[in-house]
Amino acid sequence: MAKIIGMVSTSHVPSIGSAIVKNLQDSEYWKPFFSGFKPIHQWLANHKPDVVIVFYNDHGLNFFLDSMPTFAVGAADHYVNDDEGWGIPTLPPFKGDANISWEIINGLIEREFDVTTCQNMKVDHAFTLPLKLLWPESATCPVITVPICINTVQFPLPSAKRCYNLGKAVGEIIANLDSDLKFMILGTGGLSHQLDGERAGFINKKFDLDFLDSLVQNPTWATQYSIEELVEKVGTQGVELIMWIAARAALPGQVRQITSTYHIPISNTAGGIVLLENT
């Protein structure tokens, strides 16, 4: 049977891509963030996942405000990146596996998640940059990917509890796949930040650290809060942490933390990184 071997979650702000292009990884501003990936690179080299399930949000490349699904799953054999206007070079297509995607889609429908199915899907920086951070030396991403897009842009947004249940369902589906593939879960976005309005620049360090701590022993902790309460605590864009919640929920059983990094600010955002593996 298929096996989930671990989870990585990371921030995905576009300025990360600019820092990579400009070779700023060792600069005073960026080094604390990029250095957090060194133990993750070693872990990936040792464990070699075959498939990565990516929980992310779209910022207008594939979906826009006039058509924004709550949950969408890619069901293609490749996914393309495109210019978003950030000055970040587009990346080569990412490998998919439509058969794996359809197993997940069918399983979610059976569990009463009404997902949008995308047989042609563009993926933006929220998907591409985290994968580039994981495999920085690879010209093309070396793993099969399955994009699972969660709406964090157009209200109403799915609750943290709903996203937890989504991730849990995905984990159950993977565990029942008749396959010897090794799966890793990737959650992207956050942590606390707000890009506009009266609270532009808002960061809540205490909540971020409490949230990071909860991922190991109490992964449902943040589900006590409504979306409106999360916006108050982490900012309008900080609600991207619901992707982390979904990713964590996909991990079965007990987990242990291999590494965790928290660095502020990266482009007015609280930067977070975590690697958990099953015990």
Regions of interest found by a model, annotated:
Residues 13, 58-60, 191-192:
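Catalytic metal-binding/acid-base residues of hydrolase active sites
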Residues 1-50, 62-165, 176, 198-279:
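Flexible, D/E/H-enriched segments
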Residues 50-56, 148, 181-189:
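Beta-strand elements within well-structured catalytic alpha/beta cores of enzymes
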Residues 168-175, 181-208:
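A contiguous pocket-lining binding segment that forms or flanks enzyme active sites
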